Regions:
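Phosphate-group recognition and catalysis centered on beta-loop-alpha active-site segments
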Residues: 1-190
Length: 190
């Protein structure tokens, strides 16, 4: 069930207030030192570089203090995992088509800035930690899609080189062959 935006915003404000009000104390220096910085969708807020493109993701390589990068994957019609946040191309590219309705070849010909998961893994895989958000969407061939993820991430160590982020607990079952410690369920409004 999707909440009206005004209700979602109020609930978000309430949650932030409760967290701020109930937080017992400032983190200790040890806790601060244990924190890791992740770039959200690469250089998410840089108007010169569209989010989740190879340029925005690879930019983290220039920053030693950035531990890793968070990005989302969506599946094309021919079941290739692409690095993209939205189900359609409207917000980033001004096109209302859905990624799931295009083959990877069509997508790459018309929107060459959108990388495949494989390209991102090859470029960043062992150099920066990957936080891969698996979106809640229709999975027409879940066994095949799981195999594709396994093959794409085969050279990396789950939990050391990457984690999966899930907003939907149902998706957790689709990743059954990956170690549980490499799968993080995230709560909240996103």
């Amino acid at each position: 069930m999707e909440l009206p935006l005004v209700v979602e915003n109020r609930l978000h404000d309430l949650a932030e207030w409760l967290i701020a009000w109930t937080t017992p104390s400032e983190p200790t220096p040890e806790q601060w030192n244990a924190c890791r910085i992740f770039a959200h969708r690469g250089l998410h807020d840089d108007p010169r570089v569209p989010e989740n493109t190879m340029a925005s993701l690879a930019a983290v390589l220039y920053f030693e203090d950035i531990h890793g990068v968070e990005f989302d994957i969506r599946w094309t019609k021919d079941l290739v995992p692409m690095v993209f946040h939205d189900p359609d191309l409207q917000r980033v590219f001004g096109n209302s088509e859905r990624l799931a309705d295009l083959t990877s070849t069509e997508l790459r010909q018309r929107f060459p800035l959108i990388p495949t998961l494989s390209e991102v893994v090859r470029r960043l895989g062992e150099r920066k930690h990957l936080m891969i958000e698996i979106k809640e969407e229709h999975y027409p061939e879940p066994e095949h899609q799981l195999e594709v993820l396994q093959e794409t991430l085969a050279g990396l160590v789950p939990g050391e080189h990457f984690h999966f982020l899930l907003l939907d607990p149902v998706t957790y079952e689709k990743l059954s062959t990956f170690p549980k410690a490499s799968i993080l369920l995230v709560g909240g409004f996103n």
